[in-house]
Amino acid sequence: MYGDISAKAAHMLSLPKVSDFFTRLIQRVSPKSYQQAYGEVYVTQKFLENFCGDQVRFLARSFAVPGNHLGQQSHGFRWPYGPVAIITPFNFPLEIPVLQLMGALYMGNKPVLKVDSKVSIVMEQMLRLLHNCGLPVEDVDFINSDGKTMNKLLQEANPRMTLFTGSSRVAEKLAGDLKGKIKLEDAGFDWKILGPDVQQEDYIAWVCDQDAYACSGQKCSAQSLLFIHENWSQTSLISKLKDLAERRKLEDLTVGPVLTFTTDSMLEHVNKLLEIPGSKLLFGGQPLKDHSIPSIYGAIKPTAVYVPLEEIVKGKNYELVTKEIFGPFQIVTDYKSSQLPIVLDALERMHAHLTAAVVSNDPLFLQARFYVTNQVIGNTVNGTTYAGLRARTTGAPQNHWFGPAGDPRGAGIGTPEAIKLVWSCHREIIYDVGPVPNNWEIPPST
Ligand SMILES: NC(=O)c1ccc[n+]([C@@H]2O[C@H](COP(=O)([O-])OP(=O)(O)OC[C@H]3O[C@@H](n4cnc5c(N)ncnc54)[C@H](O)[C@@H]3O)[C@@H](O)[C@H]2O)c1
């Protein structure tokens, strides 16, 4: 049934009239450019296409292992949790709730869904579309509430599993309140390393701009810290980055309102960083002008602050530098080859290992081998890591696993592996039907 629902819903979302409706609805509540909002609709549609036909059935593929005697065999099953909850943030009003909701349903659960109330109209409309495509109305409960009310509901209803996507603060609170019966997709302080091989400067500057500033930096995968190898100092990468950032404008929402930080709080953060010795403002650092964005939201120009590497790793600065600012903001630093171990130490100390990019086509730089201690991939743990010249931190489509690593509570989104991991548990049924051998006698007690 869910294969059929997915096929119909994928078809509906492929109709220009419908995809345009959802794109514009997303834009109304989560300010981003048309292209970025459309990206959500597109990924959602492709995800639904992936689970048409028998693909939902195949998600629950089981296996059997021969037993010790005739009639015995063990079967491993992916088993649903039953009553589950899904909590999702404001920044992806369609993609995150649809992908997680359908994953929960595909694996046979009964979910209650709570989307951030600022943006939940998008999912309300999408549920109507899904009902129209055959989703039985009793299969999903949809609640609109604030966080406090949802917290109470979870504690009273006691779902067997809750999937939380949002800030680390709420994630940790819920992990305690729900006694660990939770999977998390929480904050990202995502980094990118430009390796020693300098090439394709324009392309790499463009990807950096998109990663840091698209959706005004309000993606959990947004580039927050950029490490640039000293070989790039001969290039005009920074000035290109500045030019690209300055192209962004409020009129088309290529930069726009920040929903969870005010202008003052972001500028105060910039000023605190500028007190660190050797740091400097590369560009931005000013409020947006000529707008009517209410002051409870933030509105700043795309901003980059340079902080020297040796200052970043100092105890007193580290926490400040690695604070997630959910807005158009990034830290930039540089490093020499001999300083790679310091870079790796800075990455290791981060608490949220979500996305990362290692921009290099030098395989020895990318890979770690046990006798080379300072290479990147083998020394880091981020769940979604892009490696190679075209590496990015954002843009993970439905065909890439997206989620943190290194935390047993870490969830994933999008792929069959993510769905099976998050929305089902392993159950083994050992069939042992006999026959009991004809000559069997009661053995001595053991
Ligand atoms: N890892 C990921 O996949 C991912 C994806 C998107 C966003 N994020 C993170 O989300 C954050 C931004 O989103 P946000 O500001 O909406 O996050 P948030 O934590 O404030 O809210 C997330 C959701 O939790 C609800 N909530 C808040 N308090 C709650 C409580 N006590 N009990 C139950 N529910 C509660 C909110 O109403 C909302 O629906 C950033 O930190 C970002 O990195 C992570």
Predicted segment positions?
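Conserved C-terminal structural/oligomerization subdomain of aldehyde/semialdehyde dehydrogenase
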Residues: M1-A7, V115, L135-V137, I238, ...
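Rossmann-like NAD(P) dinucleotide-binding subdomain of oxidoreductase/dehydrogenase enzymes
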Residues: Q27, F58-I204
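Hydrophobic packing residues within well-ordered alpha-helices of enzyme cores
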Residues: L48, M123-M126, L153, L174, ...
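Short, solvent-exposed loop/turn segments at the edges of secondary structure
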Residues: W79, L99, V137, D177, ...
